[in-house]
Every structure is written in C-alpha cells, then in structure tokens.
Amino acid sequence: MAAIDHGADAVYIGASRFGARAAVGNSVDDIRKLCDYAHCFGAKVYVTVNTIVYNDELETTRQLLLDLSDAGADAILVQDMAVLEMMDGLPMAAHASTQTDNRSAEKVRWLRDVGFSRVVLARELSLDEIREIHSQVPDVELEVFVHGALCVSYSGICYASQYCFGRSANRGECAQFCRMKFSLQDSNGREVLHDRYLLSLKDMNRVDHLEDLVEAGASSFKIEGRLKDLSYVKNVTAAYSQRLNALIRRHPDLYCRSSQGVCSYNFTPDLNRTFNRGYTTYFLHGRMPDIASMDTPKAMGAFVGMVKEIRHDSFNVAGVASFANGDGLCFLDEARQLIGFRANKVVGNRIYPYRMPHGLKPGTRLYRNNDQEFDRLMSKPSAERRIPICMTLRDVADGFELSASIHDKKYTLHYPAALQQAQKPPHDNIIRQLTKLGDTIYVCEAVDIPAGFNYFIPNSLLSDMRRQLVEKLVSQREEPLQLDVAKPSACAPYAYPYLNNIANQMARDFYGAKELSAYELKGGDGPIMQCRHCIRYALGYCVKHGGQRPVWQEPLSLILGDGRRFTLEFDCKNCQMNVYAS
C-alpha cells in the first residue's frame, strides 16, 4: 500500500505460492485488501504466479487463480504456459513475465498471439531493440525495468542455482549464485583474478531516461522492489512518480497517468539515499563499461567524502555531506574488501566509530550505506495521496442533486427534500460542509452552485449528502476484463529443449510437445547461464569493442570457493557470454 500512497499506478505482489520469491508470500485476504485500496485510485494489482509448476501442483494453482480472481486481481504475471491455460475465462489479464525470456520481436509476437496483453521485456535490451520490437508488434503493451537489482543471466534461463544447490530460480528459490566470489583461471591453470564478484552487477537506475523509453514504445515502467524495505519502496516510487509527472507536464497531449490521485510528500526523494550497489543504465544505450560491482555484492551507498585526518578514536571527512549518529559507513581496503562500521558519535565532519576500522587511511573514499536521518524520516508517515474532485449542487423539483466529477467521469446522487428558502446566503456554509472530506482519499477543489441558488439545507443533510457521495465514489469499480486465450501451434524455439521450462503435462500439451522437459526435471548439457554481461569486455580484453588482445589462454573458467569449475564461452557473434558447468 505504501507504493500506492507514494505514486504507483500498479503494484506487483506475490501470492502464498508460485511467486518468484518463494520465501515471501501474501494471503489471498491480504491481496483482496490491497486490491480494494488500489482500485480506489484506479491503480492495478498484478499478482506474480510466475514460477514453473509441477504436475502435482496444477489443481492447487487452478484454485489459487480462482481465488485471486475473486479477490479482484487485475492481472497475473505468468511464466508457465499451464497457468495461461488455466486463466482461460477468468477476468484477469495475462502478463508475460520476463522469466519467459523476452528479447526478440518474434518471441513477443508469439506471446501476443497466445493471449498475453503485456510483455515484460528482458532487462538487457537497448533502446534500439525496444523500439524495434514495438515497431514490429505495436499492439502489445511493453513493460520495461527501470530500477533495482539486476540478474546477470537472461531471466528464466538461469539454471546455476538449480545445478549448484538444488534451488531453482524458476521456482522462486534463487540462491544468488551471481553474488558469490569466483576466481578466474585460464586453460593453463593461470589465475587471472582471485576471489572477485565477477558476476555481480550494479543496480539499474534509469530515472533520467524515462522519456527515451516512452518514445521507444514502453508503456509501463517496472521497479524491482522484492525483498526491499519500506524506505526503499517509498523513496524509489516517489522519485519515479515525480519524474513521470514532469514528463507528462511537458507532453500533456501525448501522455497521461493510468491511475488517479495527487501525491504530496513530506520528504525529497533521493535515490542515492536508498539501498544500491552503485547504479548503471545497463545496456540501454548499448554495451557500456563498468556495469559490474566486482568488489562487493553488498550496498555501498552514496559517496560522502574522503577521509582526511585520523586519530586514535576518530577521523574527519573532507566533503559537504552531513552525518548523523548511527550512520552506516563503509570503504574498500587495499585488498578491495568491503569494510563497514557504525558512527557512534558525530561532531561536524568528525566521526567517532564504535570501533576504529582496520585499514582506514587518509585519502580513503568513504560511502554511506545506511542513512540514519533518512531512515527516521521514512519510518514516519511520508506521503498522502488524494483524488481531486469537483462538486456540483443543483436543486430539482423534489430536492437536490449532488455530483462529483473526477476527470471525465461524473457521479450523481439524488436527495429528496423539501425546498426551503434560506434566510441568509447559504453558499459559504454549503461549501464549508461539503468540502469536509477529512481522512477520505478525496480533496474537493471546487463546489459549483448556481448563482440563484437560495435554499436552506440543514448541516445534517449536507453531511449525509457528502458521506453518501463519497461512498458512491469509493464503491466504483472498473468492469472486469474478459480474456481470450488463443491456442498456439507447436513451438520449441530453443537449441536446448529445457530452455522452454516445461514442467507439467498441461504445458507440454500447450506446446504440442512430447519430449521437452524443464532443466529442473531432467537437467541438460547446455549453458546454465546466458549473459549479455561479458567478463572479457569488463576487463578490457574485447577486441570486437576496441580492447586489447587477451593475455590468457582460453577457455576461461570461474572457480567457486568450494572448487567447482564453470567454463566461459564467449559468443562474440551474438555478443553473449555463456556459462557451462564443467
């Protein structure tokens, strides 16, 4: 609900099962309450049922979909085509999860043809690629990620967690293989790099590129917010909502928000004060250097200055940042290890840690990964969302009509009453009583009363009129969407059959296939990860992009801390790095 209050037009939420975060779930009753609240603002609720489903779970999934439909969910985010089949006839839209690996116009067209109204595109796509997909498939909504954590593999075709730990990312149990330490060896056993986070990416931040994305064909912006705290949800939602509003103000004839309500904030959104591993626009403008966070997978936060002078119990910081008692601070030592500590006391720019951290030296770059003052601010009520309405009061033969207008919609109620001439001008009192909307989600901007209106209306009746009108506004719901699910022809587009993620008979029948099975069921000898992130490029050795010629003997291998080895294949033709279990 905090995301709605801070400006979201829609929210994703996981149900009790089959969401992409198995450890986090919400009851149907909680989802119903969220739907009721969101729908007051015309905002939507999308429920994630985007894992693959096994045969013995099909009936449970079917019942869950029925329950979610009854709760008022607007759409279901889908990976397994059995879920799409079971949605046939239910009044919810089907959105294709990024877990369906959506990186080509061909794939997006196929998803549209089988019944999806919206496709969440792969995070890796550039503006040009998004634009090309939109030009070829203009009649499907394209949702793009704009902020948050990045998976290093194309989503839906990462099997590293399943291979290593028996925990499938396609079942919502990702073990964060890409946030682990690896050493890099060449084929002669020479160590190129030791104990680095070679697959760990920075976090996405595209707040400065919303207009570019809209012009390319994006119709929805997605913030990755799973497993994040309340402060993150509030701050990031508000930041993007404000930027989107600014975009609409520049182009009022082209764009509008899909929900209602004006937000007022008790804080200034600042993305640097929220959890982040450093920011990147990823591949939005093509391949760029420095998208990885190889020193640490943890949040370093914003740079706050350089360590200047060190004493036995304190140090001071050169810079303009202000600090607070309890701030979490960190730095990288000479071995590029992240060292974190708390500020016990702050006096100006002098910081007294609980314990002086080892390795801190003059000239060290200091970061703040926990902003105590900002967190305190975010822990309080920080935003209010109200829907502006305009009221109109008219006299009719047997009483009064009170209307409320919201944008282009008008809601009218009739109140039988005897018409009594007022002894003194009634307008001021009528306006005062009708605009007392208190803790409702509405704010009255104007009350239109005819100039010749001169009737006495008791305050008790005015209060009843106001209350009944608000109840009518709150009770309004959009008509449910009727979904038609088309039947596809047999489709097995991948070189490695398990990449279709078919884990049950219903999905197998959907594809018209007999032998295709998910990696989780039968394994496979193909890549366990396909990545646009390229370690060779990141280290400056991509000849295709002007780098120097490699000094090592390929193939390269990633060595996990427990000794397991993973071979890297550089598919330069497709500008892709594949990871194989050795």
Predicted feature locations:
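Surface-exposed amphipathic alpha-helical tracts and adjacent flexible/coil segments at the periphery
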Residues: 1-5, 10-20, 30, 34-35, ...
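An active-site metal/cofactor-coordinating segment within enzyme catalytic domains
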Residues: 23-27
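Short glycine-enriched loops at secondary-structure junctions
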Residues: 51, 79-83, 100-102
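Short active-site loop/helix that positions an aromatic residue
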Residues: 84-89
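Short, glycine/polar-rich helix-capping loops at beta-to-alpha or helix-loop-helix junctions
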Residues: 103-107
